[in-house]
């Protein structure tokens, strides 16, 4: 069986093609999903990619979270479908209530476009089993609203229950506790601000470290079949 991973396109999405390529290089079939779709076309997992969906009006991800396709994603994700939000996709997952916290303007109010080392904190999620805890992965980041914020009790919960997945080693955006990515209680839903789909080939990225997220998802899918 070949795993099918859907990649959503909203108006303003930028990185859907890159995410689809990452899915294919990892060994799965990439399935295009449009923001107005309600049928997820039989996919086994979903990637919500980066960009500036709906121009980031209201708040980043706020309008996209209400799109028809996201209503279907929310239903399936709550049933255990592996779901990954990257950058704007992470913002969308928080707005949709699938992940806790919020992403706000970077410290210093600047847009940052950098390659960054992330520490893998939790390698037991559907998207991180190809890594070891403590691994450092080198991936691009590009965002203006990536500063992870949450109430103190939420931070305590995320830390105490192992829901922090990635930490910045350079924390250029001011995220609380250096948090770059988190998961939900089941480990099936993951969001991160940096871009693993831009680190899959040495020709175009700073490393191939990002491919591990997509291979991990394929393994999670096949393990449940």
Curated annotation (Swiss-Prot):
GO cellular component: cytoplasm
Glutamine amidotransferase type-1 domain ranges (all copies): 4-225
GO terms of molecular function: ATP binding; glutaminase activity; phosphoribosylformylglycinamidine synthase activity
SMART domains: GATase_5
Pathway: Purine metabolism; IMP biosynthesis via de novo pathway; 5-amino-1-(5-phospho-D-ribosyl)imidazole from N(2)-formyl-N(1)-(5-phospho-D-ribosyl)glycinamide: step 1/2
GO biological process, one term: 'de novo' IMP biosynthetic process
A Pfam family the protein falls into: GATase_5
The entry's keywords: ATP-binding, Cytoplasm, Glutamine amidotransferase, Hydrolase, Ligase, Nucleotide-binding, Purine biosynthesis
Alphabetized PROSITE patterns for the sequence: GATASE_TYPE_1
InterPro entries: Class_I_gatase-like (IPR029062), PRibForGlyAmidine_synth_PurQ (IPR010075)
UniProt-annotated location(s): Cytoplasm
Catalysed reactions, semicolon-separated: N(2)-formyl-N(1)-(5-phospho-beta-D-ribosyl)glycinamide + L-glutamine + ATP + H2O = 2-formamido-N(1)-(5-O-phospho-beta-D-ribosyl)acetamidine + L-glutamate + ADP + phosphate + H(+); L-glutamine + H2O = L-glutamate + NH4(+)
EC number: 6.3.5.3, 3.5.1.2
Function: Part of the phosphoribosylformylglycinamidine synthase complex involved in the purines biosynthetic pathway. Catalyzes the ATP-dependent conversion of formylglycinamide ribonucleotide (FGAR) and glutamine to yield formylglycinamidine ribonucleotide (FGAM) and glutamate. The FGAM synthase complex is composed of three subunits. PurQ produces an ammonia molecule by converting glutamine to glutamate. PurL transfers the ammonia molecule to FGAR to form FGAM in an ATP-dependent manner.
Assembly mode: Part of the FGAM synthase complex composed of 1 PurL, 1 PurQ and 2 PurS subunits.
Full protein name: Phosphoribosylformylglycinamidine synthase subunit PurQ
